[in-house]
Amino acid sequence: MFRTILLCSLGLTTLSSAATHNITSIFSSSLSPGAQIFLPSDTNYTEDVTQRWTTYDAPTYIGAIKPATVKDIQNIVTLAASNKIPFLATAGGHGATITYVNCTNGIEIDISNFNTVSIDASNNTMTVGGAVRFEDIIPPLYEAGKELPTGTAPCVGLVGATIGGGIGNLQGLHGLILDSLLSVELVTPSGDVLTVSTSENADLFWAIRGAGANFGIITSATYKIYNATNNGLAMSANYLFPASENRSVWEIFQSFDETLPPELSLTAYSGFNQTTQEMELIVNAIYYGPKEEGVSYLTNFAALNATETNLMMVAWPNVTSSMAFGADGDACTTGSYLNTWGLGLAETNIDTYTTFFNELQAFSQAHPDYSGIFVVDRYSSAAAAAVPANSTSYGYGYRNINSHLLFENSYPSDNSTLDNAVNSFMRSIRSQFQRTSGFSEMEIYLNYAHGDEGADVWYSPQHLPKLSQLKS
C-alpha cells in the first residue's frame, strides 16, 4: 500500500495520445537483450508481468516493460517522458492508494529482475535489488544470524515498504525499516543515476525516506542489519475470541498504551463469519525472547474465553506464517477487489473500538456480498520515536503512532451501490476513530493511506514545503 505522486506525472502534460503509442517500436531499440516488452493481449500477460494486489481504482496500462539493466530503466524513463507516456514502476505490487487511478494508458515498469540479495555479515550490511520482497531476505539473513525489521506480509516489496516508513514486529527493537536504510541507487525523473545517502545527495536521501516514490526509481538499496534477537527464535501466540469478548480484548490493548515491551507486538484481526452470522476476533502476539517471558505479558488474554488458542516457538522465517493461525495467504493473493482505508492512533478508546466492532457486524449482515477485515497493528513506538522527527521526511507525528488501523474491504467489483455504501461507512468510521485518536490532527502510516487524506496528512505540514522545493 504505497503512496506516489511521482511517475504518472513526470512532466507529462498531454496523456491523451498515449493509448495510440506502439510501445514496441518506441522502446525496443533502446533496450538490452535481456529486457522484455509485454502487451495486455499477450496470452501469458498476467503470469509474465507483476500483478497488483488489489484492482480497486487501479492504473491502466497499454503495456509493460521488464528492464534487465539500470541503463534500460534510464532509457525507458527518458523515452516515456519525451513521448508523453505516463508510467509506474512496480516491484511487489502492493500499492493500494486510490491516487493510482489517475494513471491511465501508461506503461508498467516491472523491475522484478532486480532481485539480488547480498549480505555482508562482518560489516552488518545488506544490499538488495529494488524488487526484492520480504520473503527473499528473511531466510538468508536468518542463516547469517542477522535480522532486519520487515512487515508481516511476506510478498510485499522491501524497498516500497521502506520509503513509506516500514512497520513490523521488529520495530520495537530497531525502529522503522527506513531507519535502517543506508543508501540507494536511484534513477531520477530525468533519467540520471544517483547514489543517495547521508554523504551523497543528502537532501534527496532525506526526501526518499518517507516520500521516496516521488523522486525516482530505486534500483538497489543498502541496509544496516542486526544480530538476530534470541538466536532468531520468537514466541507466537494466537487466540480466537467470540464477539462477546471484543470489549475485553480492547481493554487489554488499552493496557499497553503506556508501555509495550520492544520485543512484543500485537495484531488483532476482526471479521464477520458468514456461517455463524457473528463477528470473530483473532489476536496474535509475537515476542522475540524466551517463551516464559512472552507468556507473562499475555495472562489477561489467556484469562478470557477464547474458543481456540495455540502457542509455539518459531524460527524467524516462520513468524509470519504462524500468525492468525496460519491465515497469512490472503495478503499475497493478487487481483482481488480490495478497498483499503487506514488511520494511526496514539491511544486506545475502548468505546470507539467496541462501537465500530458492532457496526461492522451490522454492516456485514446488511450486505451479504461484503467481506471486511479490520486489522490493528500494535508495535512499540519507542525506537522509532527516538529518531529525530526532522532527520527524514517521514510524516512528523507518525513515529508516535501506537496503533496502526487497516480496514480491508472486499466485495464484487461490479457493485457500485456497495462501493458507495462502503466508502460512506469508512469515512464515518475513520472520523469516529480520529476524534478519539489522541492526535489533534489525522496521522497515518503512509502505506496504509486510502488516498483521499491529502498531502498534509501523507507528508505532514512540517515536511511538505521542503519536499515541494526538492521536487521542483
UniProtKB/Swiss-Prot annotation:
Enzyme class: oxidoreductase
Keywords: FAD, Flavoprotein, Glycoprotein, Oxidoreductase, Signal
SUPFAM superfamilies on file: FAD-binding/transporter-associated domain-like
Signal peptide positions on this chain: 1-18
Regulation: induction: Expression is under the control of the azaphilone cluster-specific transcription factor azaR.
Transmembrane segments: none
Entry EC number(s): 1.-.-.-
Glycosylation sites: N22, N44, N102, N123, N227, N246, N273, N305, N318, N390, N415
Highest taxon of source: Eukaryota
Pfam families per the UniProt record, alphabetical: FAD_binding_4
InterPro entries the record matches: FAD-bd_PCMH (IPR016166), FAD-bd_PCMH-like_sf (IPR036318), FAD-bd_PCMH_sub2 (IPR016169), FAD-linked_Oxidoreductase (IPR050416), Oxid_FAD_bind_N (IPR006094)
Protein's pathway: Secondary metabolite biosynthesis
GO function terms (MF aspect): FAD binding; oxidoreductase activity
Residues in FAD-binding PCMH-type domain copies: 54-228
Family that this chain belongs to: Belongs to the oxygen-dependent FAD-linked oxidoreductase family.
Function: FAD-linked oxidoreductase; part of the gene cluster that mediates the biosynthesis of azaphilones, a class of fungal metabolites characterized by a highly oxygenated pyrano-quinone bicyclic core and exhibiting a broad range of bioactivities. In the first step, the non-reducing polyketide synthase azaA forms the hexaketide precursor from successive condensations of five malonyl-CoA units, presumably with a simple acetyl-CoA starter unit.
Protein name: FAD-linked oxidoreductase azaL
Organism annotation: Aspergillus niger (strain ATCC 1015 / CBS 113.46 / FGSC A1144 / LSHB Ac4 / NCTC 3858a / NRRL 328 / USDA 3528.7)
